[in-house]
């Protein structure tokens, strides 16, 4: 009811605030006997953590995860997996000036209206700091998916502000601070971000995330369609304002002869559907894109009101990402992993015995 748990069979409950003592999560429903490498969990957290480049927030958090339960001798036990990350670099004094103010485009006003009280320090529970635990849980899901079904999930930044990539080289993604697969675009992105920092402004981004080696049959029509649950998961990421599956909104301008993914005995000839038909996976790559809005915390003054309704100008202090999309790739990967694993387990439970004569090559 309170919206802090995600999933049906493979569930994740997170807790903690941006400037609290710690962040944590409980992962339940993990199959037993799966080899879980804590180093791989930490690796994904390191990809997301703040303070790694001048283009992201300068808050310095080690984000070292502690696995408290559910793993014994390197394998899942089938019991709840508890994980914890301590907050170590809070600077709550930076937010003293806005404790009675509503920052434009932030969750300050809506949290205040819903709960009648809000933790103004770094946004409290509404901060993207919480996504560290989604990444930790998603890293567990990734390992289960790869072990049981061979499914792999990875993503990249496909657009930074007005700069869109023109090619995808997976080897380049970890060679720059933007998760950008197009090396030719990196210098342009760097120059753009430097100018943006001098201006004191922010910008949005687009992330693409893909599950490869998918299996057909995942998804529970009518109300738990795979693409519907994926859109739900991705829209739940902080700052996300749009989700596309496959061709997405480009489908509006396509003719049916172009958009339909024709089939031969050797497989599908295209993947405009993004790997989902009728809410069920086809076995092709599952492809999604998310649009993230510009960061709302700016050093430039903006008009707002305080909790008494008085007009004010807000200037946000503190350390903030000039583009939240730069660190969003591992978060999007995590949410896709949680959705795919949850549906894979649900499919295995009800339809695991189903066999058909023919499978279209993915």
Swiss-Prot record:
Cofactor: FMNH2
Stored Pfam families: Chorismate_synt
Keyword Amino-acid biosynthesis in record: yes
InterPro entries linked: Chorismate_synth (IPR000453), Chorismate_synth_AroC_sf (IPR035904), Chorismate_synthase_CS (IPR020541)
Gene Ontology CC, one term: cytosol
EC numbers: 4.2.3.5
Molecular functions per Gene Ontology: chorismate synthase activity; FMN binding
Residue positions binding FMN: 125-127, 238-239, 278, 293-297, 319
Keyword Lyase attributed: yes
Reactions mediated catalytically: 5-O-(1-carboxyvinyl)-3-phosphoshikimate = chorismate + phosphate
UniProt: NADP(+) binding residues: 48, 54
Entry's cofactor comment: Reduced FMN (FMNH(2)).
Pathway the protein acts in: Metabolic intermediate biosynthesis; chorismate biosynthesis; chorismate from D-erythrose 4-phosphate and phosphoenolpyruvate: step 7/7
Family: Belongs to the chorismate synthase family.
HAMAP family found in the cross-reference section: Chorismate_synth
Free-text function comment from the UniProt entry: This reaction introduces a second double bond into the aromatic ring system.
Name the record gives this protein: Chorismate synthase
Protein source organism: Teredinibacter turnerae (strain ATCC 39867 / T7901)
Gene name of the record: aroC
